[in-house]
A protein has these predicted regions:
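Adenosyl-5′-phosphate
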Residues: 13, 19-20, 68, 92, ...
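ATP-dependent adenylate-handling ligase core
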Residues: 277-339, 357-373, 548-555
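Hydrophobic (often cysteine-bearing) scaffold residues that line and stabilize catalytic clefts
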Residues: 74-78, 97, 155-156, 216-224, ...
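Phosphate/ATP-binding catalytic cores across multiple sugar-kinase/actin-like superfamilies
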Residues: 221-243, 337-342, 513-518, 654-659
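Conserved phosphoryl-transfer catalytic core
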Residues: 368-414, 418, 425
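Short acidic/histidine-rich active-site segments
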Residues: 344-360
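Cysteine-centered catalytic environments shared across enzyme families
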Residues: 1-321, 675-678
Length: 678
């Protein structure tokens, strides 16, 4: 039954509504002070019934606009507030909400359903629709798979995109790994009846409200205020709060601001740091610099305490999808279980902070496009002062700073290449680099390969994606960039918001497959451990402001991400605030390949014997060849790094498929009973 498959969501109970053609189930997890008054599904006097999973951040504003009596304001849960907003403003209510939410409202008089998902997709919502017959929705796919009228056929295009590592910056589509099950897209609402199905993008960014910001200092102060408010909204709970503290700029910013907010309330912030027990990937000194300032209850999680295959399989079951974590699932499993053990009901992250507050690389890209080579050289010189600290390949790391600068300038300032870049002839760019032998060097040399081209991600999609189709088995070979649907996705998100053209590349990075996919993963894994995962950088107010941050401010004379660095002055330790390097986790990935028991070869062969379709999806010869190369000392590290990710994607797929086949989902109602659901 659906309610059984989703029972992990009902930490504080559940309730049902069943009347006429409609049925709803609500699972309770108390977070905010007023959530203890939730009684869902909730029916209004006007015959509208709501179920919601929501944290509404602009409650004070809505309570005033809806003229809620003063004596009842403290007792109105978010679901009741959303229902009142819908009855007041109709479908426009979704864009009046700030926060993380999904909700569905059934109109008993018109036999019509209205569903909406928050602006960035922090909370997931899935549905199955058989027009004129049935519309079913759930917070997790497994809830829909528990219904026997929902087909369970897998989507091979989705599998091919996963295996080939198609760019996460492609446009987000509503398809899941199951052909018949769709996801409500972020910033969209659905209207459904027996005769109608429609979906609409609703986000009005209203960027003109920032027109009063003129100077860098104006933007820094506005960013600081908005960021602190974003964190504060996510700490509104009577339960313990946790934060992921890697020691990076983003997680440290969130942790330090949350610490200050909670200290003022006499509370401590639980922090969790993933100790990968590998010197090359050690961020502990940065985390310890934050912890030294006090106000934290810290927990170290050791990655080696968790089995690789077991945790990968657990993540597949929780998410109804192959894992997509960049760092291996044991690293994530550790702090998820730790948060659960401490009784925390909110986990704060710095997720995608470097996408929302970007690197300001337009400062390099614009003069490249315009052929302003003197300006480019000047700005590149600033960039290179810090680029020498990046985690490049071992070969390039051994070079002197001057040689690194000369190397990049030599490539980018070559006349033929300059003309091709200026004219956006990307195929020619690749050809030039290939002929000169610099293609691998440039695009394998750590951060730089992406960041110079970052603002042109749509045009450079084929280069940035770096998909590799040789890993695809015979049944998936058709799903390359020449496939119409793959090609469509690679164009990036449509400009539904109507924003100016020069802001579109940044908008497309935010409104992308990767952004929403990882929100889904965090939400599901958190739900299975009894807490909500909250991402302050994904607050709609912060995103709207960040689209307008001056490029020169973010570039910050080559230090990059200047807005967040300047806004965090006096809030976090200087050693972390000015940190120029992100850790490279590829040594951890290599170690996992070398030490996994059983070996990747044995694991694959055993799974393929049990599930022959894996040989149709995965090119076995290529898979085994890549393992041999990655374990060998005869190949350069940068070459092996290009291959190893597809091996992990293959293992993730194996565990997803095995979970799907070996854990049949419970069925709830017979097919014949649902044929006249409307």
């Amino acid at each position: 039954m659906m309610k059984h498959s989703l029972r992990h969501l009902a930490l504080d109970g559940m309730n049902m509504y069943l009347k006429g053609p409609a049925g709803m189930i609500s699972m309770y997890l108390h977070i905010s002070p007023e959530s203890v008054y939730e009684r869902q599904p909730l029916e209004s006097a006007k015959g509208k019934i709501i179920v919601a999973d929501a944290r509404i951040d602009n409650r004070v504003q809505l309570l005033e606009e809806l003229q809620i009596p003063e004596e009842t304001k403290a007792f109105i849960p978010d679901s009741e507030l959303i229902l009142a907003a819908y009855e007041q403003w109709g479908e426009e209510c979704a864009d009046r909400l700030i926060g993380d939410f999904v909700f569905a409202i059934w109109d008993t008089h018109q036999n019509r359903l209205f569903c909406a998902r928050d602006h960035i997709g922090a909370r997931p919502l899935y549905y199955y629709h058989l027009p004129g017959k049935v519309f079913a929705f759930a917070s997790e796919i497994k809830g829909l798979l528990a219904l026997d009228f929902v087909p369970q056929d897998l989507d091979e295009l989705k599998i091919a995109a996963h295996l080939s590592r198609l760019s996460d910056f492609r446009s987000y589509v509503d398809g899941t790994y199951f052909q018949s099950i769709k996801s409500v897209k972020p910033a969209h609402f659905l209207t459904v009846s027996a005769e109608q199905f429609s979906q609409k993008f609703y986000w009005d960014l209203r960027l003109e409200r920032f027109s009063h910001l003129k100077t860098d200092e104006d933007f820094i102060q506005e960013f600081r205020k908005t960021f602190i408010e974003s964190v504060r909204c996510r700490t509104r709970t009577a339960f313990p709060i946790a934060a992921h503290l890697s020691g990076g700029l983003d997680s440290s910013s969130v942790s330090c601001v949350a610490r200050d907010i909670l200290q003022a309330e006499g509370k401590e912030l639980h922090t969790f740091h993933m100790d990968v027990e590998l010197p090359e990937c050690d961020e502990k000194p940065y985390a310890e610099a934050v912890l030294a300032e006090g106000g934290f209850r810290h927990h170290y999680v050791k990655i080696n305490d968790y089995d690789y295959y077991k945790t990968t399989t657990e993540v597949a079951y929780m998410t109804d999808a192959p894992s997509a974590f960049v760092v291996t699932p044991p690293a994530q499993a550790g702090w998820m279980k730790g948060v659960q053990k401490e009784g925390c009901r909110v986990l704060l992250t710095g997720h995608e902070g470097d996408i929302v507050v970007d690197y300001g690389m337009d400062v390099l890209w614009e003069p490249l496009k315009k052929g302003q080579w003197e300006v480019f050289e000047e700005k590149f010189e600033e960039f290179a002062q810090y680029a020498v600290n990046f985690n490049f390949s071992k070969r390039i790391n051994a070079w002197s700073p001057q040689k690194i600068k000369t190397f990049y300038k030599g490539i980018l300032l070559e006349s033929e290449l300059r003309d091709s870049i200026a004219e956006r002839r990307w195929g020619n760019v690749k050809g030039i680099l290939t002929r000169r032998g610099n293609w691998k060097s440039l695009f394998e040399a750590g951060k730089f390969r992406v960041e110079v081209a970052w603002p042109a991600i749509t045009a450079l999609g084929r280069l940035k994606a770096n998909p590799n189709y040789t890993i695809l088995g015979p049944g998936l070979q058709k799903y390359t960039l020449d496939h119409p649907e793959v090609s469509r996705q690679m164009k990036g998100a449509e400009n539904n918001a109507g924003i100016p053209e020069h802001l579109l590349p940044h908008y497309q990075q935010i409104f992308s497959e990767g952004m929403t996919k990882f929100c889904d993963i965090f939400a599901h894994v958190g739900a299975h451990h009894g807490f909500k995962v909250a991402h302050p950088f994904l607050d709609r107010r912060l995103i709207e402001l960040s689209l307008l941050l001056p490029t020169t401010l973010n570039f910050n004379e080559g230090k990059r991400r200047g807005t967040i660095r300047e806004a965090m002055k006096g809030i976090m330790p200087e050693s972390v605030r000015l940190r120029a390097v992100k850790v490279n986790f590829e040594p951890l990935i290599h170690q996992t390949l070398l030490t996994a028991t059983p070996s990747f070869e044995e694991y694959y062969k055993s799974a393929a014997e049990q599930h022959p379709i894996l040989r149709i999806w995965i090119n076995e010869k290529e898979f085994l060849k890549r393992i041999e190369i990655c374990k060998s000392n005869d190949y350069p590290e940068e070459f092996k790094s290009k291959l190893i990710w597809h091996l992990f994607r293959s293992i993730y797929l194996i565990n997803f498929y095995s979970t799907y086949k070996e854990n049949p989902y419970e069925k709830e109602v017979s097919r014949t009973e649902t044929e006249s659901s409307w």
